[in-house]
């Protein structure tokens, strides 16, 4: 569970000794982050959190451009402070540089989060790659990782845009991913809606099938999916979000072994359709075909996941074709058992030079179809 502790606006969703602008002293008068942590851990879930405080340097800046209450004098502790001009997001050296006062406050707030809530993962949004943050981010990472060691916990920072040295955290790709599997840990954060991270009355929901396909594609490439839902102001989860989560839970109950704790196989996929490299690539659904498969391994089994169920119930997985040349980097193992997860009957299958043929007449599914392959 990964609630936002503080977003760009600078209002803390937790009890803080560093600012009065927080949910414990104002609004609901509750430590929402602390309550979510307790609820998550009581259900056996890991608690993580995110900070977007870095972007507060400029988030209120446009308020200076018209008649508003964003005006001088402003000082540390004011809600709008410092309201600087919005920089070019691609400029790592944009001016004015964040001040020492702001950076010290950023560091103190993040340390407070770590000490009070002990998150397993700590996510930062994009602006920490600015040159001014680098010495502070190094101090923060050292502090957090040393805390994790003292707690006996494996903790990690999620970062974007090479804000940290490669290998010192988890590479984050917002609303996107990679075309090929990566040899390092990475994560994509995306939402159930295409047009918003939070609840609105005009959400453009993705389908449950699309989100499950994203999950499968990401895991097959050594990634993790961080899926955002947006509660209403009263804390209730919108029906559209609930339906997606319910569909995912039903699918995971049957097919979870193919993704939960699964690793990358020698190849991540076959078929004509693939994701593209980079961020903000989910504006339109990727239209997978019955020829598209993703592969994972778990517990000594290979999992072949068909991204769209063929209407005739006949599957062909070319990556498991018989090979006459043992020198080629192809599959040369012996298939012993082929199981369609969630199917009560026995799938008929055979292997030839074309591939692994599986026949399940009459089988239909709107979601990815998972085959467990037991091999020698």
Task: Describe the function of each predicted region.
Residues 1-376:
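Mature catalytic domains of secreted/periplasmic carbohydrate-active enzymes
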């Amino acid at each position: 569970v990964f609630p936002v502790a503080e977003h760009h606006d600078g209002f803390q969703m937790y009890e803080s000794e560093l600012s009065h602008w927080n949910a414990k002293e104002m609004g609901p008068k509750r430590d929402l982050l602390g309550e979510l942590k307790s609820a998550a851990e009581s259900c056996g879930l890991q608690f993580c959190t995110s900070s977007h405080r870095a972007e507060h340097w400029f988030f209120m800046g446009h308020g200076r451009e018209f008649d508003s209450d964003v005006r001088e004098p402003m000082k540390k502790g004011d809600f709008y402070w410092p309201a600087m001009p919005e920089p070019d997001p691609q400029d790592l050296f944009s001016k004015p540089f964040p001040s020492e006062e702001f950076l010290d406050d950023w560091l103190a707030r993040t340390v407070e989060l770590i000490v009070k809530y002990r998150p397993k993962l700590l996510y930062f949004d994009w602006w920490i790659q600015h040159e001014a943050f680098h010495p502070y981010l190094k101090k923060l990472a050292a502090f957090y990782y040393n805390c994790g060691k003292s707690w006996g916990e494996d903790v990690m920072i999620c970062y974007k845009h090479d804000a940290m040295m490669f290998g010192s955290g988890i590479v984050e790709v917002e609303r996107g991913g990679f075309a090929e599997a990566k040899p390092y840990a990475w994560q994509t954060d995306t939402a159930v809606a295409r047009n918003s991270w939070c609840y609105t009355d005009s959400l453009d929901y993705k389908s449950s099938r699309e989100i499950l396909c994203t999950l499968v594609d990401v895991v097959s490439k050594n990634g993790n999916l961080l899926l955002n839902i947006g509660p209403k102001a009263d804390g209730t989860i919108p029906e559209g979000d609930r339906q997606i989560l319910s569909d995912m839970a039903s699918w995971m109950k049957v097919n979870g072994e193919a993704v939960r704790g699964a690793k990358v196989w020698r190849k991540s996929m076959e078929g004509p359709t693939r994701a593209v490299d980079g961020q903000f690539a989910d504006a339109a659904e990727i239209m997978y075909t019955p020829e598209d498969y993703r592969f994972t391994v778990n517990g000594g089994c290979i999992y072949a996941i068909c991204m769209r169920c063929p209407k005739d119930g006949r599957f062909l997985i070319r990556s498991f074709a018989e090979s006459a040349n043992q020198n080629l980097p192809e599959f040369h193992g012996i298939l012993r058992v082929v199981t369609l997860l969630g199917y009560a009957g026995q799938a008929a299958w055979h292997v030839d030079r074309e591939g692994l043929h599986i026949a399940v007449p009459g089988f239909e599914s709107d979601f990815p179809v998972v085959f467990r392959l037991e091999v020698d």
